Amino acid sequence: MENDAELISEVAAGRSENTPHQAAFWKVSGSFLSKVLGFVRDILVAKIFGATYVVDVAQLVENVLLNVVSFVTSPISIPLVPELTHARLQSQRDYRSLLSSVFGLFSIVGLILFTAVAVFPRLFVVLFSGGFKGAVLAYAEYTYRWMAALSVIIVVSATIKTALAVKKDFVLLSFSDVLMNMVVISGLLFGTRQMELPILKTGAQLASALALWVYFAIREKWFILPRYGHWDPRVKSLLKQAGPLFIGSATNMLLTLIDRTMASFLPEGSIASLAYAQKIFGLPLGVWAVQISESSYPYIVSAFATSDVGKGYQLARGAIQRILFLIVPAMTGLLLLAPSIVRIIYQRGAFTEANTALVARVLQGYMGLLLFSSVQFIETRLFYARRNTMTPMFVCLAGLGMNVALNYLLGFVLHLGAYGLAIASSIAAFASMTGMYLVYRHMYGAVDYTLIFRDVLKIGGGTLVMAAVILGLQSRVHILPLIAVGFASYVIATALLHEDEAMGYLKIGRRLLARVARRNL
């Protein structure tokens, strides 16, 4: 183990690696800023193009290409992190051999899709948007041809992002989407119109991918190129590990389809209420929980690669504590303020008070899903760090079966409608989280989550203070300042309780204020 640790130190010598806290900070900051810029981008698109077929086509084509490529690259990228980490322990040559081989595999997928889209755009229009006719059909074919290059561009980004994650360098990795949105916003401000929009979107993705590729080349003193012959033998092992993840991805898509299909038999507005609610709770889930789980994963893998299991468990516990620090108050705030939040976001025009009540109730039903799936992100990565992708797949399949059964029971037998489907998802998420914990404990031993129990209690105490403040001021204060005051009370309460995460953020705040003060002197 000591020799492995020395090897990692030698490999990392002279390289700047982020700490787990820094990695989480960069990932969350980049994701949040990207969301904000994405909102600005959408406002500009709406102002210039309105709700026309131009926007419909551009969004649909981009989503189709992103999803098709990501369906292949994402399941491979997850086990690629431990494989690359182990390769680094062997030698830099092994690391580069595996990375360039995977780049070759990814690029083949991208080139095949690029050729198919560029040569047969109408086939993709028929497959994914059969309702397009006339001028809309012609514009869709034009857009597919121009955006076909995304198939190759995305695999470049996916390869470099995985490599940077293994190197624990999260700065540009986290802000590449920010750069992409800035390019799109700049193009819109400088007069991009209907025929230039697909070119602008493709160019923005290209700028982001090139920035990643050049940065990686400068950092590593190595211009990575795809390898097409004599692939690294570990690619076979990688594909075997990726197999269950392909099934898991398909399972998640299938569950979404089943939810929507079952909701179609419920009263009008049920499908829409599920979608609207998911967009709201998806913000803390995507900006916080997903980013922290992704940023912590390479560190857990590195600990396991050097047989330092205790360190890996410590990192996993820290990641869960960091996730709970925001997810618990976010869940509580959404439970208490769901009607007001839905009202301020959606209630205008044809969206009535009755719609607000339905979406708010569904949103409250999803709160268990928000909490339990956030914790499960770390649990699954403990399996992945051990190169075990099969077990999480079986737990996922069991969760799918339970979710469908609960959908029928709560949504139809007990007549809870869309709210019942949301509750079913929360119960199934709790069962999956618990099952993942029990199976891991049986296979590998305890992770000692009780070591963070005291801090979790402090998070709960701060959340109770926040809830009391919200309930006390809810009838007298507007929703936006109420959210700010409630969250401030939570941070102060957890800091007074000396909760680790709160104290860490206060230290960061004091350092930033001190730097500003020194500059002003």
Please state what every model-predicted region is:
Residues 2-20, 214-252, 310, 442-460:
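Interhelical loop/hinge segments that connect adjacent transmembrane helices in multipass membrane
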Residues 46-67, 139, 237, 263-285, ...:
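Interfacial/gating helices of multi-pass transporter permease domains
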Residues 132-160, 186, 351-379:
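Alpha-helical transmembrane segments of multi-pass membrane proteins
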Residues 171, 179-210, 390, 398-434, ...:
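Membrane-interface helix-loop junctions in multi-pass transport and translocation proteins
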Residues 74-90, 289-308, 320, 379-380:
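Helix-loop junctions and terminal segments of transmembrane helices
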Residues 22-46, 201-208, 212-216, 231-302, ...:
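Transmembrane helical elements of multi-pass membrane transporters/channels
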Residues 2-10, 471-521:
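Membrane-proximal transmembrane or re-entrant/amphipathic helices at the cytosolic face
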Residues 112-134, 332-352:
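Short membrane-interface helical motifs at transmembrane helix boundaries
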